[in-house]
Amino acid sequence: MLKPGVLNRRLVGEVISRLEKKGLKLVGLKMIHINPELASNHYLEHKEKSFYDALVSYITSGPVVAMVWQGDDCISVIRKLVGATNPLEAQPGTIRGDFCLHTQHNIIHASDSP
């Protein structure tokens, strides 16, 4: 899922291109607005943390791009390309390492399960 910052910075095409270059196939894409209830459920594990409200506020601040990808070892390939959550720890060449400016505004979410 590409978060609001990606759209604001016009990086959607670049992110999709990087995923396709890894041999993955985009099989679904939808631009949506996440409501506060869905955001709360998505970030439930962080509910008691100090940054929770900022996470919910950011993800609901504009449209996101939900995507479904297909390919060999897809989840592992995507998570490796996405990079560490903290952009200061993300390696150059990863999406977060190259484009993220702030941990909470890390431009992309990648699932760890199908």
For each feature predicted by the language model, list its residue ranges:
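Non-catalytic terminal and connector segments of soluble metabolic enzymes
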Residues: 1-114
